[in-house]
Amino acid sequence: MSMVVQQEQEVVFDAAVLSGQTEIPSQFIWPAEESPGSVAVEELEVALIDVGAGAERSSVVRQVGEACERHGFFLVVNHGIEAALLEEAHRCMDAFFTLPLGEKQRAQRRAGESCGYASSFTGRFASKLPWKETLSFRYSSAGDEEGEEGVGEYLVRKLGAEHGRRLGEVYSRYCHEMSRLSLELMEVLGESLGIVGDRRHYFRRFFQRNDSIMRLNYYPACQRPLDTLGTGPHCDPTSLTILHQDHVGGLEVWAEGRWRAIRPRPGALVVNVGDTFMALSNARYRSCLHRAVVNSTAPRRSLAFFLCPEMDTVVRPPEELVDDHHPRVYPDFTWRALLDFTQRHYRADMRTLQAFSDWLNHHRHLQPTIYS
């Protein structure tokens, strides 16, 4: 088993070998101005919000609104996700990422697609590669009723019954629960933006039929952690992210002009706003730049659920959020168009939504019948 295989200028990331190497391939070394360096990172003060049945609704709405106005990140507890399911989801993640590289590559992600196994971003980019492996798959809330391939069927098809069946059972339940929680949070977000009364269910209904993404992240230990990143600085292009971290820290958020850490808290889920919801809120709430760092002693794992609308649903803010003082900031678009942009044309960063809007306006000008 070799550390790096060079085939047509493409690097293969083998975590089982690379994690013990004192030198790392140059493709994983980030520029000094972007790498973590040796500066100590302080912890970010993040709201810890009880969203349980007994929580006072007005307090939850207020805390969520304040968090989104500050930096877009908050923690939720008493969220209704059973601890046993979270633990089993992490066990299944361990089972997958400890498979031999060849077994994991049975689910290899194809160019231009958002689902499958990815060992770093090899094949997509040639520099500033992230120090991680991922397994991503689609979750459709309407999958069962429309006969679409579900999470379980996808994982069995890609990994075979031996490895895929148990993962499929666990992550089908996990995604269902994440979708449920996402819809509850969407209703809270709407209320915090002033969408109340008969319209308070607006965002819940918008995402009721969602076409979301589930991602398992594995960040191996690295003997040069100050020179690389587990995930580079970016804003999520999706609508809402719900993250469960293991006990190893690594998530950092750009807030108050510097990088700040969000430490893991047992039982808590990390929630943040993405670019698509930023557009839906007419930029009242903004997606926040964040990254993941690695360390030299312990691997880090996380489970990320990315709430997304159905592919061809038009993303535009509700009428309550557009007025003379708040004119439209972004053009109408579909999630399919934004997803395709990030997979084929643009590497997600802090400017993704603006770059996409500029690209969309340019192409609509050139070919209005196609992009209108």
Curated annotation (Swiss-Prot):
The tissues where this chain's protein is expressed are given as:
Preferentially expressed in reproductive organs. Expressed in the epithelium of embryos and the tapetum of anthers. Expressed at low levels in the shoot apical meristem.
Which GO BP terms sit in this record? flower development; gibberellin biosynthetic process; gibberellin metabolic process; response to light stimulus; unidimensional cell growth
State how the cofactor is bound: Binds 1 Fe(2+) ion per subunit.
- Enumerate the catalysed reactions: gibberellin A12 + 2 2-oxoglutarate + 3 O2 + H(+) = gibberellin A9 + 2 succinate + 3 CO2 + 2 H2O; gibberellin A53 + 2 2-oxoglutarate + 3 O2 + H(+) = gibberellin A20 + 2 succinate + 3 CO2 + 2 H2O
Query: Which positions in this protein are listed as binding Fe cation?
Result: 234, 236, 290
Please give the superkingdom of this protein's source.
Eukaryota
One Pfam family per UniProt: DIOX_N
The record places the active site at 300
Q: Fe2OG dioxygenase domain: which residues?
A: 209-309
**Could you say which EC number(s) this protein's record lists?**
1.14.11.-
Gene Ontology molecular function terms on file: gibberellin 20-oxidase activity; metal ion binding
Induction info reads: Negatively controlled by the level of physiologically active gibberellin.
Q: Give the miscellaneous note.
A: Plants over-expressing GA20OX1 have high levels of bioactive gibberellins, and exhibit an overgrowth phenotype with increased internode elongation and leaf sheath length. Plant silencing GA20OX1 exhibit a semi-dwarf phenotype.
User: What's this protein's name?
Assistant: Gibberellin 20 oxidase 1
This protein's species is Oryza sativa subsp. japonica
